[in-house]
Amino acid sequence: MAKTILAARKHIKKQVVDGIAHIHASFNNTIVTITDRQGNTLGWATAGNSGFRGSRKSTPFAAQVAAERCAEAVKDYGIKNLEVMVKGPGPGRESTVRALNAAGFRITNITDVTPIPHNGCRPPKKRRV
């Protein structure tokens, strides 16, 4: 009986020059997603899956580590320029942008896309600590 040899097909990653970094910085976590211009996800990382748990997720250092891991995940695509979209009021807003810049990306512009309600839903009650 003849054996069929299955050739493992190597997945060739397309080369993308320009990308968009979507940063969602909430009070509890930071999510970094890098997409191409059409919005197709190339890689992502969060403070939670970078090894931080509990209140350590909501630190600027955790956001920095998440940005570095996301940059490492998409380096095979050959991205040179990044447009940064920041959403949310969290502590990881600034450190994430600094980490992406330090990872070797040229940041073309930074846009704040935080949704601001025109008097929509009622906000959560104030905390009493």
Swiss-Prot record:
Transmembrane segments: none annotated. One of its GO terms (cellular component) is ribonucleoprotein complex. The keyword Ribonucleoprotein applies. Pfam families: Ribosomal_S11. GO terms for biological process: translation. PANTHER family: 40S RIBOSOMAL PROTEIN S14/30S RIBOSOMAL PROTEIN S11. Belongs to the universal ribosomal protein uS11 family. This is Small ribosomal subunit protein uS11.
